[in-house]
């Protein structure tokens, strides 16, 4: 039986080995690239796959149609997911005739969702387990195939329980996988009335509330002990982390948060005292409790506290859906540079925003807007400004997958717009320069230019008309129901983190990334229809500054406006862009690590994009609205943008890959 496996972490390693031991053929393994902001104490699935000689991949979005097609070509009989962190689309789940099965770290239907290992300890459970279940669209809701119970000892902490669960998982898989291989797959429906769901835990969730019962505080310490981030408190403004503790029943009448003694170090809770066995001050080293008290300058009777409150008015909360994308991650950086903004974000990956994950004003949830509607509705209600940036926005996908473009770019975003109407929230919506279509004006005016597209049998226009229809719906909601909105239309923004060379390898990237990939790999640069199409290329820094000013919205000048954001002075054909890029490439200090230039190759758009494609000769913005509403003027020359973008991608190529 041929299997495709999605796996990560120690559980992923156990699962891969168990599938092999049961005699399955593994066609491919899909995993994640390690996040540099995460403490990777666990085993590497990618390394294990490499050692076993099994093809392994770590795509940013495994649900992308390109990857769905690749998995379909593998023709799996069965699919397994062992602690893979992203939900799999229904298209993938339906690829295997025998079904798709997930290993979950709890006794389902209890503790569905994220971090069940930590949550069972937080809640003081005495038992947990592992469950193998059939995968359906809803997370962790499919029929149960098998489960194994695990007792939780009073001295168990997150790491010891993790090891127990890994051992239980291996025993479970060793028992059930041979049976499944023979076609005998048990199926027991979950009782929805018994289901509980828990969300992702964040480092800040480790903050101790000394007014809680001592058992609650002690369980929190157990649940997030090393290598997790730890439970923490403050002495004045100094943060300290508690790595291990024990319960003392007598608080001697002290107020919660009061230091009862320093040797041993004991702190009063609501109904007892917590003895701190080991801890750490700030970024220091772990020490025993009495030494920690000395380091912190604690004395009996001192009061521990919550972090100092920030003064001034409440920060502006900005919700960014698609926060890991090109615009989303650059906008996040700009907002976090200002003290009065707090960013809430969702995306299906976090590689581009890993540098923000520990920022106290950045709150990220990994998820899919087509699945996590409850989370989105709650955060639309909670936040002040909403930016729905999720979209399929690469031309080749318009002809490859027009229905997917419509479903995501229009239908899913319309639901978000309706939430904004319902909760009366301001929306800053990304329209696109594509809505102008084949407009013949010398420069495109937001309020006067006609929006002209081709015939229905050219699916290339599905993106343009999906965005245009949303523009019109948003405008109507503004006119009829008072929705506060601004539509912005980016014109060919470029810069670091635009997309990835891997995306270019599967044909799903912007033009400049594809050109850079050709230079990196020594393949000919393809000029579609000779590369005579002209565009106005805009530096991401210029674009983000304009977008930031839209969010600031001085004097409400942006309300109800459509604003082009582009650089009319940076007009160039694709051929001119390629020539400029080649010149910068030849001058780059890393040039010697890459193959010789393979030349230009002229190709027809039909052969590259498919029969449903039409191109546009020019696309130049009028930026009068941006000047008037934002006081904004683009300033960065195209050569500077090209050089910075090229440098980013060249330095992202592995040294060994350059040499090969």
Curated annotation (Swiss-Prot):
At the top level of its lineage, which domain of life is listed?
Answer: Bacteria
Residues that hold UDP-alpha-D-glucuronate according to the record? 393, 398, 432-433, 460, 492, 526-535, 613
Recorded hits in InterPro entries, A to Z, give: Arna-like_SDR_e, Bifun_polymyxin_resist_ArnA, Epimerase_deHydtase, Formyl_trans_C, Formyl_transf_N, Formyl_transf_N_sf, Formyl_transferase-like_C_sf, Lipid_A_modif_metabolic_enz
This chain's source organism reads Salmonella agona (strain SL483)
Give a GO molecular function annotation for the protein. Answer: carboxy-lyase activity
Could you tell me what this protein is called? Bifunctional polymyxin resistance protein ArnA
* Organismal lineage: Bacteria, Pseudomonadati, Pseudomonadota, Gammaproteobacteria, Enterobacterales
The EC code for this enzyme is: 2.1.2.13, 1.1.1.305
Q: Which reaction does it catalyse?
A: UDP-alpha-D-glucuronate + NAD(+) = UDP-beta-L-threo-pentopyranos-4-ulose + CO2 + NADH; UDP-4-amino-4-deoxy-beta-L-arabinose + (6R)-10-formyltetrahydrofolate = UDP-4-deoxy-4-formamido-beta-L-arabinose + (6S)-5,6,7,8-tetrahydrofolate + H(+)
Function in brief: Bifunctional enzyme that catalyzes the oxidative decarboxylation of UDP-glucuronic acid (UDP-GlcUA) to UDP-4-keto-arabinose (UDP-Ara4O) and the addition of a formyl group to UDP-4-amino-4-deoxy-L-arabinose (UDP-L-Ara4N) to form UDP-L-4-formamido-arabinose (UDP-L-Ara4FN). The modified arabinose is attached to lipid A and is required for resistance to polymyxin and cationic antimicrobial peptides.
Provide the site residues for: Raises pKa of active site His.
Answer: 140
* UniProt-annotated catalytic positions: 104, 434, 619
Sites binding (6R)-10-formyltetrahydrofolate sit at 114, 136-140
Query: Subunit composition?
Result: Homohexamer, formed by a dimer of trimers.
Q: Where does NAD(+) bind?
A: 347, 368-369
| Gene3D superfamilies named among the record's database cross-references | 3.40.50.12230, NAD(P)-binding Rossmann-like Domain (3.40.50.720)
Q: Does the keyword Secreted apply?
A: no
Note down the stretches annotated as region Formyltransferase ArnAFT. 1-304
Q: Where is this site: Transition state stabilizer?
A: 102
Q: Which family does it belong to?
A: In the N-terminal section; belongs to the Fmt family. UDP-L-Ara4N formyltransferase subfamily.
Biological process terms from the Gene Ontology for this record are: lipid A biosynthetic process; lipopolysaccharide biosynthetic process; response to antibiotic
Q: Where is this region: Dehydrogenase ArnADH?
A: 314-660
Q: Any idea which UniProt keywords this protein has?
A: Antibiotic resistance, Lipid A biosynthesis, Lipid biosynthesis, Lipid metabolism, Lipopolysaccharide biosynthesis, Multifunctional enzyme, NAD, Oxidoreductase, Transferase
Q: Give the record's pathway.
A: Nucleotide-sugar biosynthesis; UDP-4-deoxy-4-formamido-beta-L-arabinose biosynthesis; UDP-4-deoxy-4-formamido-beta-L-arabinose from UDP-alpha-D-glucuronate: step 1/3; Nucleotide-sugar biosynthesis; UDP-4-deoxy-4-formamido-beta-L-arabinose biosynthesis; UDP-4-deoxy-4-formamido-beta-L-arabinose from UDP-alpha-D-glucuronate: step 3/3; Bacterial outer membrane biogenesis; lipopolysaccharide biosynthesis
Q: Which GO terms describe its cellular component?
A: membrane
């Amino acid at each position: 039986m041929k299997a495709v496996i999605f796996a990560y972490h120690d559980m992923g390693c156990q699962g891969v080995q168990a599938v092999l031991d049961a005699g399955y053929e593994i066609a491919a393994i899909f995993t994640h690239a390690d996040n540099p902001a995460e403490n990777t104490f666990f085993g590497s699935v990618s390394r294990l796959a490499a050692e076993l000689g099994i093809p392994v991949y770590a795509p940013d979005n495994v649900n992308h149609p390109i990857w769905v097609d690749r998995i379909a070509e593998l023709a799996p009989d069965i699919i397994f997911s062992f602690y893979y962190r992203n939900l799999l689309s229904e298209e993938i789940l339906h690829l295997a005739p025998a079904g798709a099965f997930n290993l979950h770290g709890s006794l389902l239907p209890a503790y569905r969702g994220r971090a069940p290992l930590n949550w069972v300890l937080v809640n003081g459970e005495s038992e947990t387990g592992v469950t193998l279940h059939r995968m359906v669209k809803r997370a962790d809701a499919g029929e149960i195939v098998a489960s194994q119970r695990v007792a939780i000892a009073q001295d168990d902490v997150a790491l010891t329980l993790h090891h127990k669960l890994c051992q239980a998982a291996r025993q479970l898989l060793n028992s059930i996988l041979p049976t499944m291989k023979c076609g005998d797959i048990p199926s027991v429906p979950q009782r929805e009335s018994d289901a509980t769901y828990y969300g992702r835990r964040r480092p800040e969730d480790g903050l101790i509330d000394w007014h809680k019962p001592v058992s609650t505080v002690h369980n929190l310490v157990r649940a997030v002990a090393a290598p997790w981030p730890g439970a923490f408190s403050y002495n004045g403004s100094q943060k300290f982390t508690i790595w291990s503790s024990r319960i003392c029943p007598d608080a001697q009448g002290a107020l919660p948060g009061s230091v009862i003694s320093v040797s041993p170090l004991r702190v009063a809770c609501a109904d007892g005292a917590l003895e701190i066995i080991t801890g750490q001050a700030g970024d220091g080293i772990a020490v025993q409790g009495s030494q920690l008290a000395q380091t912190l300058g604690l004395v009996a009777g001192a009061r521990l506290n919550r972090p100092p409150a920030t003064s001034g008015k409440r920060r502006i909360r900005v919700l960014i859906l698609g926060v890991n994308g090109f615009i989303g991650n650059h906008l996040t950086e700009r907002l976090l540079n200002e003290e009065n903004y707090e960013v809430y974000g969702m995306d299906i990956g976090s590689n581009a925003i890993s540098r923000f994950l520990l920022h106290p004003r950045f709150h990220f949830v990994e998820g899919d807007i087509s699945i996590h509607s409850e989370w989105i509705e709650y955060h639309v209600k909670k936040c002040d400004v909403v930016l729905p940036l999720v979209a399929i926005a690469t031309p080749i996908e318009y002809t490859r997958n027009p229905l997917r473009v419509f479903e995501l770019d229009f239908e899913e975003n319309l639901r978000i717009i309706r939430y904004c109407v319902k909760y009366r929230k301001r929306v800053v919506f990304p329209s696109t320069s594509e809505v102008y279509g084949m407009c013949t004006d010398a420069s495109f005016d937001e309020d006067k230019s006609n929006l002209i597209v081709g015939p229905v049998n050219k699916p290339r226009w599905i993106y343009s008309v999906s965005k245009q229809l949303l523009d019109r719906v948003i405008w109507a909601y503004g006119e009829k129901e008072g929705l506060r909105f601004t539509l912005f239309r980016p014109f060919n923004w470029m810069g670091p983190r635009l997309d990835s060379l891997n995306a270019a390898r599967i044909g799903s990237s912007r033009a400049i990334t594809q050109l850079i990939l050709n230079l990196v790999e020594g393949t000919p640069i393809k000029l579609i229809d000779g590369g005579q199409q002209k565009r106005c290329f805009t530096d991401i820094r210029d674009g983000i500054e304009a977008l930031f000013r839209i969010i600031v919205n001085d004097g409400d000048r942006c309300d109800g406006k459509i604003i082009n954001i582009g650089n009319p002075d940076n007009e160039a054909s694709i051929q001119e862009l390629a020539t400029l890029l080649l010149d910068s490439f030849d001058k780059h200090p890393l040039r010697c690590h890459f193959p010789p230039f393979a030349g230009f190759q002229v190709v027809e758009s039909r052969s590259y994009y498919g029969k449903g494609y039409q191109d546009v000769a020019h696309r130049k913005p009028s930026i009068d609205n941006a000047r008037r509403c934002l006081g904004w003027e683009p300033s960065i020359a195209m050569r500077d943008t090209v050089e910075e973008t090229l440098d980013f991608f060249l330095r992202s190529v592995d040294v060994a890959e350059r040499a090969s």
